[in-house]
Amino acid sequence: MLQLKDKQVLVLGLGDTGLSALRWLARQGARLSVADSRALPPGLDAVRQEFPGMAIHLGPFTAAAFKEAELIVASPGVPVAEPQVQAAIERGVPVVGDVELFAQARSAHAKVIAITGANGKSTVTTLVGEICKAAGFKTVVAGNIGLPVLDVINDAVDVYVLELSSFQLETTYSLAADAATVLNISADHMDRYADMQAYANAKARIFTRAGLQVLNADDAWSRGMAAEGVAQLTFGLDAPRSAQDFGLLHDAGEAWLARGQRKLMPVADLNITGLHNAANALAALALCTVLDIDEVVALQALRDFKGLPHRVQWVADIDGVSFYDDSKGTNVGATVAALHGLNRKLVLIAGGDGKGQDFAALRAPVAKHARAVVLIGRDAGVIADALQESGVLLEYGDTLEEAVVKAFNLADRGDAVLLSPACASLDMFRNYVHRAEVFVKAVTDLQKKEVSA
């Protein structure tokens, strides 16, 4: 357990996580300083107001900022590989994140369910939270979704449901979740990790001292994380592997969520579209087994869940063409899941900041499902190179608004237009939510134009 009173703590990175950590550390009696590589980081005014006199180091990290630190608390956006961080580690200075501080401070009676993965983690985290709330548990959903973890520590909480990114897990050592999952691994953040193995290793840290591992039977990376001597359950889109595992069973042409050979509910009863969401529902059920929740209550919570914004979310129908917003699809794996999940002919809008990904995995699903692809953003050309042999028409849009009009004109009646960029948004937009807002407005404007035509 870290002793924080009177300890000199350097917080790296402002923004929501950094500000949350500063406030929490101040309450523990730590002596504080902060460093951020940006000249004007978000939260700077609030920090200056709340912590007058505290040393604030802005711009490229220097040895002087790190010199007196006895503990470093790194925000997720700061890589552990940063040279000054590495130099501090070599001097024996511990480097942790806010999730590690949470792990050491949380009440022992509260359960922790932890979720990570390249795709689906926000949906599964929210589903688990909804199931726990429906079962009457005082539940907090936090981490990479919602509030920072240090803002929600409360002795009255029964269950913490945490969405955790690979960045957060890099500096987490003792979470000891009651149940944890790595939903899947696909190329993402390759601008931060040396290779897929390094990315997977960061994700696998979620299983450190976990009570139950929930593994994706359909994902070789997740499956390969099974640890000896730890309880495991699997989920997947094939029949369950054992009487305790989760999967799909088929009866008279209808797919059912199942545990072992027991049919639980028809997939068609879910309000969230696509087989990837059936997998998400199965993962949520598997994670909740550590809480001994009444199955009827859990299944009703699944039925009631309407989905999250910007995850293959229906926007409008215009002249027989359905528009879907999957702006949260910021990597190749998410877009592949969306294409298979909608499982209909469509025009795909993709592109943005590719984060060093290999887009080759898009080729086969695009060839199967797409009538055309309209590419936008900085890495449009990189994606075009990867899709050249798909046999699908490739077009370009200088703006997202232009791409929406082009996609509509390329679509046939009965098709969909899917915004699923497979890329980050910051080359053209403030964030993925802003990208979604621009898309929805472009669709709405198109709808008005078609109605008045």
From Swiss-Prot:
Q: Which InterPro entries match?
A: Mur-like_cat_sf, Mur_ligase_C, Mur_ligase_C_dom_sf, Mur_ligase_cen, MurD
Q: What are the GO BP annotations of this UniProt entry?
A: cell division; cell wall organization; peptidoglycan biosynthetic process; regulation of cell shape
Annotated Pfam families = Mur_ligase_C (PF02875), Mur_ligase_M (PF08245), MurD-like_N (PF21799)
Q: Which residues cross the membrane?
A: none
Principal cellular location given in the protein's record: cytoplasm
**EC number of this enzyme:** 6.3.2.9
Q: Where does ATP bind?
A: 117-123
GO MF assignments: ATP binding; UDP-N-acetylmuramoylalanine-D-glutamate ligase activity
Q: In which pathway does it act?
A: Cell wall biogenesis; peptidoglycan biosynthesis
- Biological function: Cell wall formation. Catalyzes the addition of glutamate to the nucleotide precursor UDP-N-acetylmuramoyl-L-alanine (UMA).
HAMAP family, A to Z: MurD (MF_00639)
- UniProt record similarity statement: Belongs to the MurCDEF family.
Q: Which PANTHER family match?
A: UDP-N-ACETYLMURAMOYLALANINE--D-GLUTAMATE LIGASE (PTHR43692:SF1)
Give the protein's recorded name.
UDP-N-acetylmuramoylalanine--D-glutamate ligase
Gene it is expressed from: murD
